[in-house]
Curated annotation (Swiss-Prot):
Active site: S178 (nucleophile)
Protein name: Dihydroorotate dehydrogenase (quinone)
Gene behind the chain: pyrD
Gene3D superfamilies in the record: Aldolase class I (3.20.20.70)
Species annotation: Anaeromyxobacter sp. (strain Fw109-5)
Pfam families referenced in this protein's UniProt entry, alphabetically: DHO_dh
Family the UniProt entry places it in: Belongs to the dihydroorotate dehydrogenase family. Type 2 subfamily.
């Protein structure tokens, strides 16, 4: 009963101010209290992936914590993993506000934040100061390039982030798919993608052998370009693929006054598109690397659809904004019920189930 009233209050504030207030509250949660308040995750949801152990598939997508390292408070919500970022080598303010917009009727957001963060050095110091007791699961760091860095020099930015942040990350994610940094998505083109990911994978192997490196792809790639990106990424040495980022499409929200705002759309309108991209990545990867599903997950059924489409892990952000602090617990409990309903003993048994069913049916 508390969340509806709190949501009413927060949703009457500017979206970015509401985010700062919520994030600030989570930042102040001490590790001991976080462990006491953290909801139990059903044991059948445990996942082994990327050489790491997760107590469930549901994690926090990059974008919520941009380097403040509010680790304990975020794990207290029930997440199995938390992804920090996007972090750039040098501090940057991001785009001019207003830059975050709610489309409440559609349970969606449009953002053009622009990688606002304090930079890799500050983020590294903050992560170094996080006590071990606050880390209740894997912590990933999502990295990008500064807005002022031309694409031909982008690799240096990503390598600088890897060098500074890898000691504090259980895995790293190369973000080349945000629509809010001019020209960034061009790095998904074959030659640029291959060179960038080979450089990043090689550097991480030198600095921290065995540590996973993932790449985050856009949902707006053509089927052919998506297949090519998956192949190039795997050949370059990535350990997994995050599918997807926000979309430039406004399908389903065209008439909303905020639909005209520049930026990436997230939330419920992205769900079907993101799930289709997860499925295609899963088919193309053919078991070579795991897929992390992200985009439009607003309930347990949506998370389960991502898993059945091929996601081993699932990340959320906009669903948390609309669903509140009990959102992750509801996802986990709902997933356990859905697995049991369909006769799956573990998440791993359900991964790609819809793809395999379709293949057996000749679809």
């Amino acid at each position: 009963m508390i969340w509806p009233a709190l949501r009413w209050t927060l949703f009457h504030l500017d979206p970015e101010r509401a985010h700062r207030l919520a994030h600030g509250a989570l930042h102040r949660v001490p590790p001991g209290l976080a462990r006491l308040r953290r909801p139990a995750v059903p044991p059948e949801l445990r996942v082994s992936c990327l050489g790491l152990d997760f107590d469930g598939p549901i994690g926090l997508a990059a974008g919520f914590d941009k380097g403040d390292a509010s680790i304990a408070g975020l794990f207290a919500l029930g997440f199995s993993h938390v992804e920090i970022g996007t972090i750039t080598p040098r501090p940057q303010a991001g785009n001019e506000p207003p830059r975050l917009f709610r489309l409440v009727e559609h349970r969606a957001l449009v953002n053009r934040m622009g990688f606002n963060n304090a930079g890799a050095e500050v983020c590294a110091r903050r992560l170094a100061g996080v006590p071990a007791t606050a880390r209740m699961g894997p912590v990933g760091v999502n990295v990008g390039k500064n807005k002022t860095t031309p694409n031909e020099d982008a690799a240096a930015d990503y390598l600088a982030c890897i060098d500074r942040l890898h000691p504090y990350a259980d895995y790293l994610v190369v973000n080349i798919s945000s629509p809010n940094t001019p020209g960034l998505r061009q790095l998904q083109e074959r030659d640029q993608l291959d060179a960038l990911l080979r450089a990043c994978a090689g550097r991480l192997r030198e600095r921290a052998p065995g540590k996973p490196l993932l790449v985050k792809l856009a949902p707006d790639l053509s089927p052919t370009a998506l297949d090519e990106a998956v192949d190039v990424a795997i050949d370059a040495g990535v350990s997994g693929i995050v599918a997807t980022n926000t979309t430039l499409s406004r399908a389903g929200v065209e008439r909303h006054p905020r639909a005209r705002e520049a930026g990436g759309l997230s939330g419920a309108p992205l769900e079907a598109l993101a799930t289709s991209v997860v499925r295609r990545c899963y088919i193309r990867a053919a078991g070579r690397v795991p897929i992390v599903g992200c985009g439009g997950v607003m309930n347990a059924e949506g998370a389960y659809a991502k898993i059945r489409a091929g996601a081993t892990l699932v990340q959320v952000y906009t669903g948390l904004v609309y669903g509140g602090p009990g959102f992750v617990r509801r996802l986990n409990d709902g997933l356990a019920r859905l697995l049991a309903r369909d006769g799956f003993r573990t998440v791993a048994e359900a991964v790609g189930a819809d793809v395999e069913t379709a293949e057996r049916a000749g679809v």
